[in-house]
């Protein structure tokens, strides 16, 4: 934010540093207006996955179990304010369910927590979770995008699986 606006300094950033952090931290070393966006390069889907011990096969069943067991299901995230944390909060709000959020310090720790059953639910990026889905270590329920994911085209979207209007990228 301190470089001259001459086009020689470019920052490749994501929504966490430029929109979410402002709502989490009382002060930031920059203002959003210090930057001029030039392109949106990607929209990364999240895959809604569950530990195999959770007796659900789709989004409708997950919502039903969550409603029958308020504050008993635990979902993990890569940290407070991360995209998968916000995906979980939106899911809770739109489905009118109560689940417990546990933030971890990154993708590795939260993936281990899901694989071990420490958390039952995770919204995960395909790059970190597809191998575990294919290895039958976790169960994929849906993708958070409005269209099917190229990484796993057989998965339905959350919106078409029981939560109309749900979209996170």
Residue ranges and their predicted role:
Residues 1-5, 90, 94, 108-118, ...:
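Short helices/loops that flank or line small-molecule/ion binding pockets
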Residues 2-9, 15, 22-109, 158-163, ...:
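Hinge/capping helix and adjacent helix->loop/strand transition within the periplasmic-binding protein
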Residues 6-13, 120-124, 140-142:
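Paired acidic/hydrophobic, glycine-rich loop segments that form the ligand-binding mouth/hinge
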Residues 14-15, 52, 125-127, 145-146:
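Short secondary-structure boundary segments
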Residues 36, 62, 137-150, 166-167:
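Conserved helix-loop-beta element of the AMP-binding
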Residues 110-113, 150-154:
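Short, charged, surface-exposed secondary-structure boundary motifs
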